[in-house]
């Protein structure tokens, strides 16, 4: 497995392989999806709480929306770590004043571009979910409406 000391964070750099660039684009798509999710959630809460005369909660939802809009809200991020065989996409949450690794979102084979759901922190589940070398798969995955930050799109249907 990739230990904390041995792993190397992937720098988002276009000089790396195409597959690395695709992983970076997937991370961007997941971050957009999470931002869109949070906006929808706070807009719904604002409307609901306002109709219930819960100004404390509707004010909170409105404040959260303002923070997202002006870029000060510490939204979830997705980082890419490079291992021997896989790129590991890891969810990063903002806690105690800094972003920290939370859970593994996906594994991507560095050679083939095959995308796997995680079986645990250090290994992928069996069964390829998507292939980043396939243009139609990329077109699907790079649209934030098609992926979800919680990983539901990685389940076999």
PLM regions: where:
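Cysteine/selenocysteine-centered motifs that mediate thiol-based redox chemistry or coordinate metal-sulfur cofactors
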Residues: 146-157
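A short, surface-exposed beta-strand/turn
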Residues: 102-116
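Short, non-transmembrane alpha-helical segments in secretory-pathway proteins
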Residues: 12-68
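Single conserved hydrophobic/aromatic residue that forms the stacking wall/gate
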Residues: 1-11
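Exposed beta-strand-loop-beta-strand "reactive/processing" segments of non-cytosolic proteins
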Residues: 66-106
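A short, surface-exposed interaction/processing loop segment used at functional sites
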Residues: 112-144
């Amino acid at each position: 497995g990739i230990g904390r000391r041995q792993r190397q964070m992937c720098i988002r750099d276009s000089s790396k392989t195409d597959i690395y660039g695709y992983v970076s684009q997937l991370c961007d798509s997941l971050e957009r999806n999470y931002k869109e999710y949070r906006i929808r959630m706070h807009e719904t809460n604002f409307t609901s709480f306002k109709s219930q005369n819960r100004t404390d909660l509707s004010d909170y939802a409105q404040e959260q929306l303002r923070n997202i809009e002006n870029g000060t809200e510490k939204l979830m991020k997705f980082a890419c770590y490079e291992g021997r065989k896989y790129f590991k996409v890891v969810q990063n949450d903002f806690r105690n004043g800094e972003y920290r690794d939370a859970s593994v979102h996906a594994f991507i084979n560095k050679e083939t571009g095959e995308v796997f759901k995680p079986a645990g922190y250090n290994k992928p589940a069996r069964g390829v979910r998507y292939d980043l070398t396939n243009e139609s798969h990329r077109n699907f995955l790079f649209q934030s409406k098609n992926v979800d930050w919680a990983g539901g799109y990685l389940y076999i249907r």
